[in-house]
């Protein structure tokens, strides 16, 4: 069995889980609700206070789906109880960010500010004009939006200017040696 897939997903007290049509899972918790449809190759059951994912055979593809499905369900349960957060930093002279309505506006050295639409279900806050925090209950959506923000101006390896995740290390390169 898949090492991750064979572990049952525990359901906390304040979370309700519904399994519809055998492969559609609805998770409701204090922070909101998430619904996701999974592959019909797998069987998803609610046993006691746990969700168990079972697979019909040991084909490589099905084994991979087994672990993936269990991890996604676990992330749904964690999302509706704790939520997820990604933090980004802007580094560079004059680099600023601000939230205006449902848009994140980035001024990162281009001739114009870059406006990004904040997806529904996410909360974006900016501290000190240089620290961006993306919060939400859907791990995939939080990570995807944070990656989109970072891709506007990824940190460059010479001076380290750009947008990076908090705590991300950028490998510095030596500049060219110049004439002597």
UniProtKB/Swiss-Prot annotation:
User: SUPFAM superfamilies per the record?
Assistant: Ribosomal protein L6
UniProt function note = This protein binds to the 23S rRNA, and is important in its secondary structure. It is located near the subunit interface in the base of the L7/L12 stalk, and near the tRNA binding site of the peptidyltransferase center.
Q: Which domain of life is it from?
A: Bacteria
Q: Which UniProt keywords apply?
A: Ribonucleoprotein, Ribosomal protein, RNA-binding, rRNA-binding
Q: Name one GO cellular component term.
A: cytosolic large ribosomal subunit
How does it associate, per the subunit comment? Part of the 50S ribosomal subunit.
What's the source species for this entry?
A: Dictyoglomus thermophilum (strain ATCC 35947 / DSM 3960 / H-6-12)
Q: Name one GO biological process term.
A: cytoplasmic translation
Q: What is this protein called?
A: Large ribosomal subunit protein uL6
What family is this?
Belongs to the universal ribosomal protein uL6 family.
Q: Molecular function terms in GO for this entry?
A: rRNA binding; structural constituent of ribosome
